[in-house]
Amino acid sequence: MEYKDTLLMPKTDFPMRGNLPNKEPEWQAKWEEEKLYEKIQEKNAGRKAYILHDGPPYANGELHMGHALNKTIKDIIVRYKSMAGFSSPYVPGWDTHGLPIETAIAKKGVKRKEMSIAEFRKLCAEYAMTQVDGQRTGFKRLGINGDWENPYITLLPEYEAEQIKVFGEMAKKGYIYKGKKPVYWSPSSESALAEAEIEYQDKKSASIFVAFKVTDGKGVLDEGTNIVIWTTTPWTIPANMGITVNPDLDYVVIESAGEKYVVAEALLPSLREKLGFEDATVVKTVRGSELDRVVTKHPFYDRDSLVMNGEHATAEAGTGAVHTAPGHGEDDFLIGKKYDLEVLAPLDDRGVFTEEAPGFEGVFYDTANKMVTEKLEEVGALLKMEFITHSYPHDWRTKKPVIFRATAQWFASIDAFRDDLLAAVKGVNWTPAWGETRLFNMVRDRGDWVISRQRAWGVPLPIFYAENGEAIITDETINHISELFREHGSNVWFERDVKDLLPAGFTHPGSPNGEFTKETDIMDVWFDSGSSHQAVLNARPELSRPADLYMEGSDQYRGWFNSSLTTAVAITGEAPYRNVLSHGFALDGEGRKMSKSLGNTLLPGKVIKQLGADIVRLWVASVDYQADVRVSDEILKQVSEVYRKIRNTMRFLLGNINDFNPTTNAVSYENLREVDKYMLIKLNDLVKNVKDNYEAFEFSTIYHQINNFCTVELSQFYMDFAKDVVYIEAADSHDRRAMQTVFYEAVVTLTKLLAPILPHTTEEVWNSLIGEGVESIHLQDLPEVKVLADSEEITAKWDAFMQIRDNVQKALEFARNEKLIGKSMLAKVTLYVDGEAKTLFDSLEGDFAQLFIVSDFELVEGLENAPESAFKSNQVAVQITVAEGETCERCRVVKKDVGVNPKHPTLCGRCADIVVKHYEA
């Protein structure tokens, strides 16, 4: 007889290697064919809703690791909620208007000026939809479960129609107005930008100190005295209309080389060296308030520059006197308005000077910096010029510097409902908690929102103009345009004449001749995505407003979180979300931003081809995503190793329940051995902890908890000593069926707990466990937390045992290193115990040799009896010796009773009994 044939070795069709790149598409095809998303919605119909509203990614370019991070976090949340008793539909979306798409079309050689706007926009729409299709394929390959056949897309007519309604409602409440004031202007994009479209980068700029000569000192300053200003934008000097000083600061008049100069007293020490005023004497001190309405002369134009009082002039830097150009700065504009100064902005859309700046016509503003500085030097007004590097606003799309430029734009007034916005921020639950402060401060400090853009590809501003120039935004026109867009799309605005866009028979007192014109500007793309609460949440029957969760990158506090809040509070009075969760950015392994120039980009598509989507998803679960996260080949290798451990654990569990039927073979909890109960209690604790952490969106804790359970509780303990039972004992023996009961519970529980994170692998486990044709794991609910008898008492006892077991393992390791034993199965453990440890072992049930995975065990009372060579800890001493007896051919345990049955001379008594009873014919 071959004794190896009597061993009950693991059998499973669940392979050791995942082969994820090839297997995952098969599962995805099956899910699509079986309409799994729809089945999940049907299963959860009638349950409490949990709505995660997808912030739309921009439909341009290949998916990057930031996309993978974002969509996977969302998918984990939605899958968890769908298995936790909620109805949680997921409607993905795309943001499809804006400059990057115009630029992409231009790069293809399309000449925008050589075709109608409507034709150009059609090309933009076609391009955007191809990008949507490409990204949709990528997201589906990542295992993201959602309504991919019916996403929301901002260029679709039904979306645009609802966006028009949002605009109309805001206009109706008086929140929309047209005004001329400085806005961020991008010469590279030839358009106004909102704050959300600005990013700061270091820029080298000329820093100049300029003298303005007093022509009317109002009895405070002598004529010819120089007021000194400092600026890092020399090109704005042609637009200078005044100088601002702080009314509450002290200013000194100093005399140097026969000239008088005025600077803030607090800044004089730093300016003495910088401007060569080392020998200057202070002639007099005046309060800033005394300088109000002093008149100076522009350095090279024949006009006055008025001295004004303003709080924004400080003694933190410069001279305390601020060069003021109302056409090129927000503070400048506001104080200029107060003092009734002209708003001069002598630049065109491309940033080129017009004839309003004599001497600089046709010059690009940045080039003009040098010319202006030279002109100031020529007229003797330049006191100092140097270069500094400072943080400067740039166009987030073109990466080129932006300027402040006063132009006529359409605005949404934030002041009109700022208090409501701030109250709404306070009413939302923010994770991380600092998100509340961040958005609150942004809303508190932000100016009005410039919503018009001078571009072609976007939703038109639905505004008509009467003959007298009056803007027309009425319920009648808004509803008509909304329905026109719903039926024909927004291109109709550019395809039809004004008369065909207005409601039939429309009249207006400002147009006695019945003539009208239409606005040519489009809306800021943030108004597009910011309207999704109306166009998606409110419009779709399966969704609702407010959403339970908005979850995006931390850059969206200034973006989508902000624009969505603004439009929602404006039209509904409340935030569009109950909870907001934000994540950091995906960086390379060294914590650097990924970029083509650094050659450190890692694309999810490539990783999925090499390792599989479940590895990318496990990486997402492993990181503390609320901060910036790192990803590299090395990090993914570490994640793959954890995946391998989880997979091997599943394979072992599946392999050892191949002859187990949970209906007929399971052992009830009360009939289990204590060590088996202990494992079920630990498993139950895991269920509670994992569910709590899913609820708190703490996925990295789940990753560590499950990895720890698989590695420590199962692999290093329970599964390890179980081999001596499940391989060796008779198939139907109580102890074997008890352990299989635990194995079955463990594999079912782990599979369900991991399903939101590893959808493909858990489906594979589930099919192997339950059989082909089974209902998907994703249609199951998460395991419930059970109340298990005596759990506290059993846990306390066995946790204490596990600590002692750790000491035994260390002693065995030491003995192996010292060559006292080979494998631990050749060892005998003698344990010397006192006090609590003695009481513990007296109360424990179990085969301790088996639990320690050695051949023999002896318990001796009294630590003092331990030999010097024993491995000692505070409670026990461990002596390792070679076990006496012979190795049983079947179970490989060293036993003194090997050969007790002469028919089976190489077997121990236990194995001989099993063979005789179950395997001899």
Curated annotation (Swiss-Prot):
Catalytic activity: tRNA(Ile) + L-isoleucine + ATP = L-isoleucyl-tRNA(Ile) + AMP + diphosphate
Places the protein is found: Cytoplasm
Binding site residues for ATP: 596
Sequence motif 'KMSKS' region, residues: 593-597
Motif 'HIGH' region, residue range(s) on this chain: 57-67
Positions bound to Zn(2+): 888, 891, 908, 911
Cofactor(s) the record lists: Zn(2+)
Keyword presence, Cell division: no
Keywords per UniProt: Aminoacyl-tRNA synthetase, ATP-binding, Cytoplasm, Ligase, Metal-binding, Nucleotide-binding, Protein biosynthesis, Zinc
InterPro entries linked to this entry: aa-tRNA-synth_I_CS, aa-tRNA-synth_Ia, Anticodon_Ile_BEm, Ile-tRNA-ligase, Ile-tRNA-ligase_type1, Ile-tRNA_ligase, M/V/L/I-tRNA-synth_anticd-bd, Rossmann-like_a/b/a_fold
GO cellular component, one term: cytosol
EC number in record: 6.1.1.5
GO biological process terms, semicolon-separated: isoleucyl-tRNA aminoacylation
Cofactor binding note: Binds 1 zinc ion per subunit.
Pfam families named in the record: Anticodon_1, tRNA-synt_1, zf-FPG_IleRS
MF GO annotations: aminoacyl-tRNA deacylase activity; ATP binding; isoleucine-tRNA ligase activity; tRNA binding; zinc ion binding
CDD domains: Anticodon_Ia_Ile_BEm, IleRS_core
HAMAP family named among the record's database cross-references: Ile_tRNA_synth_type1 (MF_02002)
Family according to the record: Belongs to the class-I aminoacyl-tRNA synthetase family. IleS type 1 subfamily.
Subunit relationships: Monomer.
Domains: entry comment: IleRS has two distinct active sites: one for aminoacylation and one for editing. The misactivated valine is translocated from the active site to the editing site, which sterically excludes the correctly activated isoleucine. The single editing site contains two valyl binding pockets, one specific for each substrate (Val-AMP or Val-tRNA(Ile)).
Protein name: Isoleucine--tRNA ligase
Organism field: Listeria monocytogenes serotype 4b (strain CLIP80459)
